[in-house]
Each structure stands twice: as C-alpha cells, then as structure tokens.
C-alpha cells in the first residue's frame, strides 16, 4: 500500500487538540453527550463504526442494495441531519440528493465531510464510460481500494478528535487496530492476486467500482458497460464490447448485485467469457451484526470472487478472517 500517501494525508489533516474542562468531563463517553454521526453508503458506515466505536450513535442513510448515485432520502431523513454532530459522505458526486438534504438541514457547526474529495486531488480523478469527464462526474468508488479506505479512516479519526477531544485516545487506538486489520487484508489480497496469470488481470465490469483498486493492485480496467445515465448500453456499444472481449481474451465479465443486467449474459455468451454477477459495490455481505457484514467482509468476498473468476487461487483471502475493531452497533438501513 502507498503508505507515503497516507502519511502525507495524516500530516496534512492532523489536528492539535487542547484539553479543556475537568478530567471527568474529558473522560465522559460521547454517548453520554449524545453525539450522533450520520453516514451514507454502508462501506463508509462500517469504516466509521470501526474508528468511532461506542463514542457516538452511527446512523446510515442509504439503504443497502440501492443505487446510491440516484437514491433520494425521504423528507423525514432531514431530522437525522438536524441532529447530527458529524456527517460523513463519500462525495465525488456520488450521493448528491442526500448531500443536498444534509446541507439544507444540518446545523451550521456540524461538519459535512466528503471523504473522497478529501482523499484525492482533481488530477487524480478517474473518468470512464460510466463516469465521463465532460459531465464532471469522477469515478467515486475509492473504498474498494484498502489504501483509500485507510485514508477515509484517518479523516474520520481526525474529524472526530476535533469534535470530541476527550475521545482522542480511543479514536487513535481504534484507528491503529483498523490499520492492522487492513494490512492483513492487503497481504492476503496481494498473495491471492499473485496467483492470477498476468494476462488475466483484466477487468470488464458492468458498473466500474474498481478503477482505483486496479491502479494500485496491477489490474487493467478495459471498460465499463453501464452508461453514465445508468441505463443500458446501445446495440452498437454492446457489439463493440463483444469485439473488445474477444480481442483481449477477458476470462470473466463482472456484474453487480445492485445493477442486474441481461446485457452481461449476452456479451459473455457471444464473446466466450464467463459471466460473474456476485460482486457487490456497497452492499455488505451477511446481515447487520454479523462479522461478514462489514467493509472488511465486503473486500474479502469481492476479491475471492474476482481471483477465482480470473484463474487464480484465493486461498490466502479465504484464510483471512474478517473482523471489526469492536462490535458494530451502527444502524444500516435495509
């Protein structure tokens, strides 16, 4: 992982906190103070839960299995933002309706942190068929890359320390423990990916959630099938993709549980590839409260699937046990 980038971010956003009030006040749990943190998509909720622990109530807004790009929260969700002490969203134009509702209702003092925007410089944005540059929509899926997930975790740690300085030691300890888990995951990913033939490290997905991951783990994304309007590609575009699959020898075409599409079956059948439809973009595996129902569990599940479909051996990922820093009591809408 690119630890130098993480260190640079740490230095850039590190906050200096000054103890205030009595020792008793500083040691009081944030739960007692009634802190509420609102998040959007489930992977961000999970990362936040690992860093924040029991120092705040954490409430997700975007239901799992929903198209987070177009999801519009009910007006009743405004109350969540009114009561929020911190709001963490992905940003990068992912959850605009949710962001707009938050901005219209949150207290002026409540920070709304766009984690993706804080993690990337504009020059680092990735654009493709699903996320065209001329529409100003960069690919927002940073959380599928463990390196960026750690960046998100560090931003959350720093933000919460600023809001709740009495919890600084807890947030730091949780972050350190999360780094250990993610480092183990990264090692299992690297070992498993090393078993994939180099010629097979090619990704063609329906919804491109892996552009940043591919950059850091030695894969090449040759295309995404879903257009920017989240509709279906035209017959001409499908024909071009079939030719591309034949020319490159892509062994597998990856779909998404959130975006089922018969087009993928057609492309795979006509081009001779295998269609795999079990990847999850932001829908965590398992049920809330289960260990697999976590960002770590999501990464393990997706990359076992990807490794197997591309001709590799996912034994190291299968041996990796997903876990959270502590019990995850966050609210995940279903």
Annotate each language-model stretch with its function.
Residues 1-7:
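Bacterial N-terminal signal peptides that target proteins for export
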Residues 9-11, 19-334:
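Extracytoplasmic metal-acquisition and chelation regions
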């Amino acid at each position: 992982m690119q630890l130098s980038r993480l260190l640079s971010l740490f230095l850039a956003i590190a906050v200096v906190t000054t103890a205030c009030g009595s020792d008793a006040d500083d040691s009081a749990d944030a739960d007692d103070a009634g802190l509420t943190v609102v998040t959007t998509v489930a992977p961000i909720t999970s990362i936040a839960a690992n860093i924040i622990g029991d120092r705040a109530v954490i409430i997700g807004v975007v239901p799992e299995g929903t198209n987070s790009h177009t999801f519009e929260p009910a007006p009743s969700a405004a109350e969540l933002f009114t009561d929020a002490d911190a709001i963490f969203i992905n940003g990068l134009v992912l959850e605009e309706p949710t962001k707009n509702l938050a901005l219209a209702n949150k207290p002026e003092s409540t920070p709304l942190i766009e984690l993706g925007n804080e993690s990337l410089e504009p020059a680092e944005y990735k654009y493709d068929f699903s996320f065209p540059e001329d529409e100003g929509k960069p690919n927002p899926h940073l959380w599928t890359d463990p390196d960026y997930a750690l960046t998100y975790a560090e931003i959350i740690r720093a933000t919460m320390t600023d809001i709740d300085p009495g919890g600084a030691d807890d947030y730091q300890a949780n972050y350190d423990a999360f780094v250990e888990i993610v480092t183990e995951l990264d090692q299992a990913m690297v070992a498993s990916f090393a078993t994939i033939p180099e010629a097979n490290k090619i990704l063609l997905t329906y919804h491109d959630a892996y552009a940043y991951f591919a950059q850091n783990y030695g894969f090449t994304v040759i295309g995404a099938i879903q257009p920017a309007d989240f509709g279906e590609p035209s017959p001409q575009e499908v024909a071009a993709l079939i030719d591309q699959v034949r020319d490159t020898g892509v062994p597998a075409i990856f779909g998404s549980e959130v975006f089922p599409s018969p087009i993928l079956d057609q492309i795979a059948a006509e081009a001779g590839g295998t269609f795999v439809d079990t990847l999850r973009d932001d829908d965590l595996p398992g049920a809330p409260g289960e260990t697999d129902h976590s960002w770590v569990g999501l990464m393990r599940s997706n990359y076992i699937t990807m490794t197997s479909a591309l001709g590799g051996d996912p034994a190291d990922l299968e041996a990796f046990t997903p876990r959270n820093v502590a019990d995850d009591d966050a609210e995940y809408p279903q």
